[in-house]
């Protein structure tokens, strides 16, 4: 197994191990910058109307996303961060890796736990 403390791939992002977010429409994503829909085993987008947070967290999609980062890949849904970094800006990925660096451990790789949950529930009155 990769020793994440000793060797963090250059493209690594901690968020898939510690974070979930939802949009006001209920779409579940690893972060607000992720620009494609996460999908379930039936290729249906994860949505709070049909799925639990645990469904997304434990999904093959999320496991594959985590593995892509460990393999040094640059996942397609993260193009906003890659674009910011290519233009010399400090991306959300870089800021959050620094912010949450104390969570980057080998145990985190084996037992990912939600540490940051951002639920955007919208502002439509339901009375």
Where are these regions (language model features)?
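A Trp-anchored, charged/polar loop motif used as the substrate-binding/catalytic surface
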Residues: 100-108
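Accessory C-terminal segments flanking Radical SAM cores
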Residues: 2-99, 118
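N-terminal pre-triad scaffold of radical SAM enzymes
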Residues: 17-26, 107-127
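Histidine (H) residue identity feature
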Residues: 7, 102-103, 123
């Amino acid at each position: 197994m990769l020793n994440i403390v000793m060797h963090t791939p250059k493209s690594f992002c901690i968020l898939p191990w510690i974070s979930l977010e939802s949009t006001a429409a209920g779409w579940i994503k690893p972060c607000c910058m992720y620009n494609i829909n996460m999908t379930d085993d039936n290729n249906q987008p994860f949505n709070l109307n049909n799925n639990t947070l645990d469904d997304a967290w434990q999904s093959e999609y999320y496991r594959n996303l985590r593995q892509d980062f460990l393999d040094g890949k640059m996942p397609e849904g993260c193009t906003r961060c890659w674009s910011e970094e290519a233009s010399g800006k400090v991306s959300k990925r870089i800021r959050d890796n620094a912010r949450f660096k104390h969570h980057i451990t080998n145990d985190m790789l084996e037992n990912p736990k939600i540490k940051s949950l951002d639920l955007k529930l919208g502002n439509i009155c339901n009375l």
